[in-house]
Amino acid sequence: ISSLDDDEVQTANVQGLQIIVHKDHPLDQILGDIASGVVTRNQLSNFCLYTAFISVIEPKKYQEALRDNNWVEAMQDELLQFKKQQVWEICPLPKNKLPIGTRWVFRNKQDESGTIIKNKARLVVQGFSQEEGIDYDETFAPVARLEAIRLFLAYACSNKIKVYQMDVKSAFLYGKIKEEVYVCQPPGFEDPSHPDWVYKLDKALYGLKQAPRAWYETLSSFLLKNNFTRGAIDQTLFKRYVGTDVLLVQIYVDDIIFGSTNNRMCADFKKLMQSKFEMSAMGEMQYFLGLQIKQQSNGTFIHQSKYV
């Protein structure tokens, strides 16, 4: 086909089908960042420099992680969160009490394109050893269904509402627990002065059976105190009205999406959450629960091109 001018369109008949050939692909049909396929030498060098400080291999055991400075830093960051949130206090193990074991879990966090952006180390407790009535009582916490997320996006799209997302860093550490629970010291980070001591928990840890409920109660109580109302059917949906404007908040454990008919209400909600919790990954909704989302003036598009 000969070269085309900017506004020129050619047609051709192939086996009875009419094919329209455009010089440029329609921009409104492109999903993803248009410029992502163009990488300059400077961008490539910056990317290589960044990835040089990210470990690609996920350790299976903490002994392997301790040999990699990237993972050691991730483990130290996790323990720093424990100190900030006053999660526990070290003490001798009381008589007739059994401590719950702890272990490290290592994961590489990826963005919507599948690129590794962070090494995440998480200390979890071995909740399978908990005994009902002793270490925990109630465990149920509502979780949003994927259908609810899609309905949220559909409602926002039909009402021209921009949807944003945020993530609560180490969310379960904010949940207050009522039971008396003791856990073993983190492997590789034992206190040399008291190697036989244990930690008494004041807040929830990942792996505890009551941790999801403790976090949900903490977050929902905070929202209800700030003039939100909880959905009658979907207990993970919260609403706040100011005059004729509405702010909608959908919760999926520690991931939150929200949107409003008034952009000022979204900005105020961000400040409200930051005043109580340490937040991360705040911005326009682009990647959520494995779904890639692109919000445009002509609609909201959901796809999973990273898996193709």
State each model region's role.
Residues 127, 140-165, 169-172, 176, ...:
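Conserved pre-motif C helix in the palm subdomain of viral-like polymerases
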Residues 24, 30-31, 62, 75, ...:
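Mobile genetic element proteins and their domesticated derivatives, centered on retroelements
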Residues 109, 173-184, 209, 240-276, ...:
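Catalytic palm subdomain of template-directed nucleic-acid polymerases
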Residues 227, 274-281:
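A common structural junction motif
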Residues 28-59, 108-134, 143, 169-199, ...:
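Reverse-transcriptase-like RNA-dependent polymerase core
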Residues 1-101, 120, 124, 138, ...:
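Short, conserved interaction/coordination micro-motifs, predominantly
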Residues 73-151, 169-173, 231-252:
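Conserved beta-strand/loop block within the catalytic cores
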